[in-house]
A protein has these predicted regions:
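Extended alpha-helical "rod" scaffolds
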Residues: 1-297
Length: 297
């Protein structure tokens, strides 16, 4: 497995196809083994003159039963290890896509994204996951195994999104773009992976994304109308604006019901620190979150 720098999809399709074919071959072998066992071993008493009770063919000490079970377990182990390796490689591919395609302007643009479309990076990540998961779902006959596989994909994808978010600076317009991307990830998890029970991960992250969009547009417009000579009034307006934003953010950070236990207060605080105006609002957020403005009388 190697990453193709020109086409991110091609480098993963070939090994994935080979593994899918191996899964199908292993299923066929197990089915043939089961048919042979049922027709030849279980009915052996009908083919020989010695009376052999059917009970002995199901005896857990029977060497045939032991060998058959061991073979089935070994095949299951190989499939599980292969799936784990496949997930690891897909996640490596997604990390590469983030490095190659995630622009700093995606979440910190100069202008707002009016078309509400996902970023190119988000589109490519979802595309490669669709290819991978569709091929695996066609290869795995066991629904329980497929559900565990999709759950692992969902959880690892969530961790990669978090890791990527912590590398970016986000402004108000970029916060809206981030929410658009997160909604597309959520749609993929719900519709393609059928992991509705894990949608809470992405809904919680969307609520975190809303913290990046908190802004006071009215205050900003008033500040621009102030005469350039009145610098003190301008600074006061800016101070009050940052104070109001900081208090609003602190209030939402402390509201644990928004994050459904997915994020702790400190984790939300850490994510919010990626705001572009963080150092302007940090003192007010600290006062609201940690009670640094409280005093003992």
């Amino acid at each position: 497995y190697t990453i193709d720098t020109e086409n991110e999809n091609d480098s993963i399709i070939k090994p994935l196809m080979n593994f899918s074919e191996l899964i199908n071959v292993s299923d066929i072998i197990l089915q043939l083994l089961q048919i042979f066992y049922k027709n030849e071993i279980e009915n052996i008493n009908k083919k020989i003159n010695m009376p052999i009770t059917k009970k002995k063919t199901y005896d857990f000490l029977n060497q045939l039963i032991i060998l058959k079970k061991n073979f089935e377990l070994k095949v299951d182990d190989f499939v599980a290890n292969g799936l784990n390796a496949g997930i690891t490689k897909v996640m490596e591919q997604i990390e590469y896509i983030y490095v190659l395609n995630q622009s700093p302007k995606d979440y910190c643009p100069d202008e707002s994204n009016l078309d509400k479309k996902p970023s190119i990076c988000c589109f490519k990540v979802i595309n490669i996951l669709k290819i991978h998961c569709q091929m695996i779902s066609k290869s795995l006959a066991n629904k329980a195994t497929l559900e565990i596989y999709n759950q692992e994909i969902t959880e690892r994808l969530f961790q990669l999104i978090l890791k990527n978010l912590k590398k970016n600076i986000v402004n108000v317009e970029g916060g809206n773009n981030l929410i658009n991307d997160l909604k597309h990830y959520l749609h993929f998890v719900e519709k393609e992976l059928k992991m509705k029970k894990l949608k809470i991960l992405f809904t919680s992250l969307i609520n975190v994304g809303l913290l990046y969009t908190i802004n006071l547009n009215e205050e900003e417009s008033e500040e621009q109308n102030i005469d350039s000579g009145d610098e003190k009034l301008r600074e006061k307006k800016k101070f009050n604006r940052n104070k109001a934003i900081g208090k609003d953010i602190a209030k939402k950070i402390c509201d644990s019901s928004l994050y459904h236990g997915v994020f702790t207060q400190d984790e939300v605080y850490d994510l919010v620190s990626r705001r572009i105006d963080w150092y302007n609002i940090k003192p007010f957020v600290d006062k609201g979150v940690y009670g640094l403005d409280c005093c003992i009388i």
